[in-house]
Amino acid sequence: MVIDKSIPKATAKRLSLYYRIFKRFHADQVEKASSKQIADAMGIDSATVRRDFSYFGELGRRGFGYDVTKLMNFFADLLNDHSTTNVILVGCGNIGRALLHYRFHDRNKMQIAMGFDTDDNALVGTKTADNIPVHGISSVKERIANTDIETAILTVPSIHAQEVTDQLIEAGIKGILSFAPVHLQVPKGVIVQSVDLTSELQTLLYFMNQNHLD
């Protein structure tokens, strides 16, 4: 199957949502799904679904719909969800602790293998209820050496985000999901995905205000 390498970011961000929808269809024993059914489940229009799918070659036939099992497996392959992906979490503050206790593996094949914080943090040397150990950040390089871990969730204060990012890159991390509302400088080959909760809330409030004006 030919896959277009220039997939727009908006499409890429919907991939996990498509995967979730097809898993739900499969659980409901739906065998075929039309672009309209997929669009309705996603809250988007069917033209967007067809355009997104066009980047991945021929996924279905016009008038026949999409094979649910085939597409579920396709997105599982695309998102590497056949084997467990281990990640680390850095920053055990309020957001970090909440994520440490979130059961990612109940929904997808990913899990937090270790947590890290400043060496003097009270949580260092302890384990969560799910047996996730928390270590001092100074040991991150040796802790993930000889493991398959290349991904980190970053939930540290903004003023420390770049410094910690540099440590993670030196340790071999290639992908960072950052909750710090600052731009992180990273070398080519390292990918940063930012989650700015304040910005997302402000965007929500903006659209709510536009609704009131209408």
UniProtKB/Swiss-Prot annotation:
GO cellular component: cytoplasm
Keywords: Cytoplasm, DNA-binding, NAD, Repressor, Transcription, Transcription regulation
Keyword NAD: yes
Disulphide-bridged cysteine pairs: none
Example GO BP: negative regulation of DNA-templated transcription
Compartment(s) where it occurs, according to its Swiss-Prot or TrEMBL record: Cytoplasm
Record-listed NAD(+) binding positions: G91, C92, G93, N94, I95, G96
This protein's record includes keyword Repressor: yes
Primary residence: cytoplasm
Entry's family note: Belongs to the transcriptional regulatory Rex family.
Biological role stated in the UniProt entry: Modulates transcription in response to changes in cellular NADH/NAD(+) redox state.
Protein name, per record: Redox-sensing transcriptional repressor Rex
Organism phylogeny: Bacteria, Bacillati, Bacillota, Bacilli, Lactobacillales
Gene of this entry: rex
